[in-house]
Amino acid sequence: PTRPSPILSGLVGSEMCIRDRCNDVISFYNEWKEQAVQQHMEKDLRSRQAFDNYEASMTGDSQFATGELGRKDLSIMLETLNSPLTARINQYLQSGVNDYCSQYNALKTTPLTSWACKFQETPEGGGYHVYHYERGSWSETARELVWMIYLNEDFEGGETEFVYQKRRVQPTTGTLVIWPAGFTHTHKGNLVLSGTKYVVTGWYYQQPI
């Protein structure tokens, strides 16, 4: 029989509730960003070091050590700024992950944990346009699954494109996407043609036994 696609995407729960939750996350970010600018932090947020650190966190130091990919996006780690909001995201996430793991017997016996919750803002012209995978360096070999939740859809472009699956996932508000972290799911974020794209993303790591 045909196996289910290793890329799971869909809504978990009622659409109205999901949209409210997504709006809450975006609102928190916008408030945080406004405060940061007011505190004269804008230069630090957009510094070369901030971009280099962000690229390293996404791709691994050894894969793109120079940080010369011309990124145009900004991220914050929600778990360090708003624990209650992160807990709500994780609660939403868990239902989708349970469904995903139920489709693949090997994952049922694999101890997984997720702690990072990265909020990412991608403006017009932005995106991560280099094909990559999420377990591309020695330091990230424990990554087992990748997850991402699209927080809005009022922009053009910005699909997540998987090269070997020949699939583009169209962003829709509240959609959770889960996929394996290995090279079989090499992907990129397509150019945001207009508007601003917001997502939260992270990884499930295999716990040592």
What are these regions (language model features)?
Residues 1-13, 18:
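Single conserved hydrophobic/aromatic residue that forms the stacking wall/gate
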Residues 14-176, 184-209:
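Fe(II)/2-oxoglutarate oxygenase catalytic core
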